[in-house]
Amino acid sequence: MEAMSFAARSTVLSISKSFPKNNSPTYLTLRPKFSRVRFTTVASQSQGRQQVSENAEDAKKKFSETTDSLKHKTSEATDSASHKANGAARETNDKAKETYNAASGKAGELKDKTQEGAENVREKAMDAGNDAMEKTRNAGERVADGVSNVGQNVKENVMGAGEKVKEFAEDVKDTVMGKSEEVKNQAEHETKKRSTSTNYF
């Protein structure tokens, strides 16, 4: 096999020497360069194909391993993220429940205090109403007693005044009647006097 590769090399070398050398710069060259041709044997071609196949197998295996590793790492990351998210969700849910329970407890306490306050206000209002009603009734009784006393006094005063007026009227009547009797008697007496004195003339 070495002999074949040596022969191939020497053949390639001799062919390459057969072309004229061009020492001028390539950008000034207008003639095309001929590419070197390498002659390979069937064995080297087979060996190359086998190497390419092995390289392709290795690349395929490495790609598969890399893909599996990425899948595994992605699955682990997803599981970890899911676990963390579930833990955070549970923690948030627990905190929300605690907050809700605390708020419910405070709302219950506030409701109880409000009911107690309403009961106290209602009781105080009823007590104040009863006191006011009692005071009003007492004041009404006093006013009624006062009015009754005033009425009795007025009645007594009116009756007393009526009696006094009656007495006064009787006094006046007696006086007037007495005077009129006196006047009548005097008039009769004067008339008699005159008549007797005219009889003498």
Swiss-Prot record:
It comes from the Eukaryota. Induction: By desiccation (leaves) and by abscisic acid (ABA) (leaves and callus). Keywords: Stress response. One of its GO terms (biological process) is response to wounding. Residues 41-155, 177-201 are annotated as: Disordered. Residues 41-54 have a biased composition (Polar residues). It comes from Craterostigma plantagineum (Blue gem). The keyword Secreted does not apply. Belongs to the LEA type 1 family. The keyword Cytoplasm does not apply. This is Desiccation-related protein PCC3-06. Residues 57-76, 108-144, 177-193 have a biased composition (Basic and acidic residues).
